[in-house]
């Protein structure tokens, strides 16, 4: 074997390695891209569930996650499962129809079939109707405000950064209660 054929063979091996590494990087790119978007496929159309049970709501809380912000409405024993959540131009108060001002580029009206009262006694009384949970500095949520409870349902205004994908589901427990969960993605 001559010096030039060794050089050619060495060049071919190095070239094959470079092509192989390039192929590995290209193959890994889609997985990385999918991970960046968190696999969210929820969409932004209205979400609804029919009522099969109802019980009074007890609390509203929220949390931040890597891919979304989450709001939870806690419901007392007996559980509840009916809801209607959708983007609106203006969130309206239950009963009066007055506008509920909200910060953010888009507004979600969250209506749960769970009154904030039981036998004429309040089961949920927010300390500050305009700020149910402090979400200052959060990635997606801008404001969570109380819009009232009337005729067996309660409405919450959720101000968000922009019209983003969201999902809604009901979890049973802890105990005999249930939780309405609203997740809004950080991005599309």
Question: Can you annotate each of these PLM segments?
Answer:
Residues 1-32:
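Secretory targeting and sorting signals
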Residues 3, 30-188:
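Short linear recognition/processing motifs and adjacent strand/loop elements at protein termini
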């Amino acid at each position: 074997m001559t010096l030039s054929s060794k050089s050619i063979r060495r060049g071919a091996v190095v070239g094959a390695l470079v092509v192989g590494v390039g192929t590995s990087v290209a193959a890994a790119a889609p997985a990385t891209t999918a991970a960046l978007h968190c696999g969210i496929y929820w969409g932004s159309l209205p979400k609804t569930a029919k009522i099969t049970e109802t019980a009074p709501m007890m609390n509203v809380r929220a949390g931040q996650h890597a891919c979304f912000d989450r709001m939870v409405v806690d419901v007392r024993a007996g559980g509840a499962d009916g809801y209607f959540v959708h983007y609106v131009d203006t969130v309206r108060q239950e009963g009066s129809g007055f506008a509920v001002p909200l910060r953010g580029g888009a507004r979600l009206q969250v209506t749960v079939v769970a009154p904030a009262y039981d036998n004429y006694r309040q089961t949920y009384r927010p300390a500050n109707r305009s700020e149910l949970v402090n979400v200052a500095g959060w990635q997606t949520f801008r404001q969570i405000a109380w819009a009232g409870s009337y005729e067996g349902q309660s409405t919450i205004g959720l101000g968000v950064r922009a019209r983003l994908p969201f999902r809604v589901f009901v979890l049973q427990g802890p105990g005999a209660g249930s939780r309405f969960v609203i997740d809004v993605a950080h991005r599309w």
